[in-house]
Amino acid sequence: MAAVSLRLGDLVWGKLGRYPPWPGKIVNPPKDLKKPRGKKCFFVKFFGTEDHAWIKVEQLKPYHAHKEEMIKINKGKRFQQAVDAVEEFLRRAKGKDQTSSHTSADDKNRRNSSEERSRPNSGDEKRKLSLSEGKVKKNMGEGKKRVTSGSADRGSKCLKRAQEQSPRKRGRPPKDEKDLTIPESSTVKGMMAGPMAAFKWQPTATEPVKDADPHFHHFLLSQTEKPAVCYQAITKKLKICEEETGSTSIQAADSTAVNGSITPTDKKIGFLGLGLMGSGIVSNLLKMGHTVTVWNRTAEKEGARLGRTPAEVVSTCDITFACVSDPKAAKDLVLGPSGVLQGIRPGKCYVDMSTVDADTVTELAQVIVSRGGRFLEAPVSGNQQLSNDGMLVILAAGDRGLYEDCSSCFQAMGKTSFFLGEVGNAAKMMLIVNMVQGSFMATIAEGLTLAQVTGQSQQTLLDILNQGQLASIFLDQKCQNILQGNFKPDFYLKYIQKDLRLAIALGDAVNHPTPMAAAANEVYKRAKALDQSDNDMSAVYRAYIH
């Protein structure tokens, strides 16, 4: 893009990296965010995403002059929402100007007409006016006394009764009032709040819950679709209590039982995502004495109202971990509205524990580091039971210093951890591990069905395998699932199929054949077609018997 003459407050199209040009506004940067050295650049707040970044002047174009051109190039839904947000911003700004001008004109007219009406025409009218004014003043004085006296009595009684009945914290609206409020669009609301609105990262002051665990700072969790499943592990070790505001708080029920070999870090820990793995991880972090703040995306997906966002968790914590299902969820968590990137400031740390491809994790690392943050990828090998038991295997790559800072956290959640070098290495290794595991599971299911159709005992086959070189906890558990017909998820089938797909793509990228993984992937795809996605990976067995 060609260089243009721009100034503070201008609406622009800004291009950041490989992303398409996006509408934004030039604003003042926060005080703690230094301007990068080198070429001239402006600090731009983007519409629709509520994101912001330093953009070189040659990557900027005036909004109005290039609006039609940009709209023709970009057709995405989020892009259209961003353009709508700009237009809404302009309409409101224009309406505000018109309202102020009309108001001043109307006030002037009202004053003039009032002066004309109040001007008496004769001495008699003056006397009549004086007498009537005296009566009015007298009546008003008596009425005022009565009203003031009655209002004061009623007011003091109401105030006293309200103070006795209401346990709410001062300054917070009650839950019922919150529910009745129609929320304004977050995008437009953020834009109309002023240039610095997105940069206020101050945490909301909250009073500590009575008898709360001192290691637990505050909990940002709303209800989910399946609380009994999602939080089964965490609620065994934690007690849930409702705060007066209606938000849910968690404190460790056995926080005193801290492992003597683990000295918890004094850093504030954030955790985003409480799925099968996340619940157990958070439970163990709390048990070992860490200060934890959590947020779960499921409630937001269902349309529930969350008091806080991933951005605020990141801004109030020193190290924030995230564990979500797939590359799209990982990107949305970081780059979406009120996402992780909004809370990143110099020195803030982000650890992504999701199993994703190397390209995705590299992209996330770049945007986090570009904001002055520190990044570590740390996908975990294991299942729900191992997560609950604190026996996961952690594969880390990226910032070595951050890896060391996470030492006590990794000890709490896993039995061992590996540092694999630069960002992307852990993602590749994790996909290879899960490729082997997924292919092995498909082979187990194939063997059991072959035993059945040839008249052999499946239980005897399992006994033989358990006495041989293939004996393992994984083999025994998955075979027991199949024999008992119990496919309660310990590792979702849809996720192992996703990992197989990503592993095959990894092989394709380096021209390496993966025929075994490809064959296993087809079996899992058939199982998904049979509605087994949300069952355990061992439900792949059903793909062979249908």
From Swiss-Prot:
NAD(+) binds at residues 270-284, 355, 498. Residues 91-145, 161-181 have a biased composition (Basic and acidic residues). It is found in: Nucleus; Chromosome. The record marks 216 as: Required to promote KDM1B demethylase activity toward histone H3K4me1 and H3K4me2. It comes from Mus musculus. The gene is Glyr1. GO terms for cellular component: nucleosome; nucleus. Homotetramere. Interacts with MAPK14. Interacts with KDM1B at nucleosomes; this interaction stimulates H3K4me1 and H3K4me2 demethylation. Binds to mononucleosomes. Interacts with GATA4; the interaction is required for a synergistic activation of GATA4 target genes transcription. This is Cytokine-like nuclear factor N-PAC.
